[in-house]
């Protein structure tokens, strides 16, 4: 699904115009981005938690050349799936919860 498809679905589901749905979607994405850029996390109970995590420096190999390179330490975004989302996806795929 593309962002445009998502916006159309949000507009239809919430009874909004596409312009309002675009504004709302852009605001949510921008806010989540700003929160993560500050190193904070944001939780939506049942849906999941967006957070950041430090990734240590490491050595990696370039598959095409076999050359080893050093990858610097960095902070990356991560998402932990919430219970309700996990169950909804499992139910939709026909799999049972472990």
Swiss-Prot record:
Pfam families in the cross-refs: Bac_DNA_binding
Alphabetized SMART domains for the sequence: BHL (SM00411)
InterPro entries referenced in this protein's UniProt entry, alphabetically: Hist_DNA-bd, IHF-like_DNA-bd_dom_sf
A GO term from the CC aspect: cytosol
Entry's Gene Ontology BP terms: chromosome condensation
Top-rank taxon, per record: Bacteria
A GO MF label: DNA binding
Entry keyword set: DNA condensation, DNA-binding
Subunit structure: Homodimer.
PANTHER family: DNA-BINDING PROTEIN HU, DNA-BINDING PROTEIN HU-BETA
Family: Belongs to the bacterial histone-like protein family.
Function recorded in the entry: Histone-like DNA-binding protein which is capable of wrapping DNA to stabilize it, and thus to prevent its denaturation under extreme environmental conditions.
Protein name: DNA-binding protein HU
Species of provenance: Campylobacter jejuni subsp. jejuni serotype O:2 (strain ATCC 700819 / NCTC 11168)
Gene coding for it: hup
């Amino acid at each position: 699904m593309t962002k445009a498809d998502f916006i159309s679905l949000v507009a239809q589901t919430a009874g909004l115009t596409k312009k309002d749905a675009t504004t709302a979607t852009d605001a949510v994405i921008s806010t989540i981005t700003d929160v993560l850029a500050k190193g904070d996390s944001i939780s939506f109970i049942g849906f999941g938690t967006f957070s950041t995590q430090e990734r240590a420096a490491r050595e990696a190999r370039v598959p095409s050349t076999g050359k080893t390179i050093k990858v610097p330490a960095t902070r990356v975004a991560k998402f932990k799936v919430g219970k309700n989302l996990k169950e909804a996806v499992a139910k939709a795929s026909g799999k049972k919860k472990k």
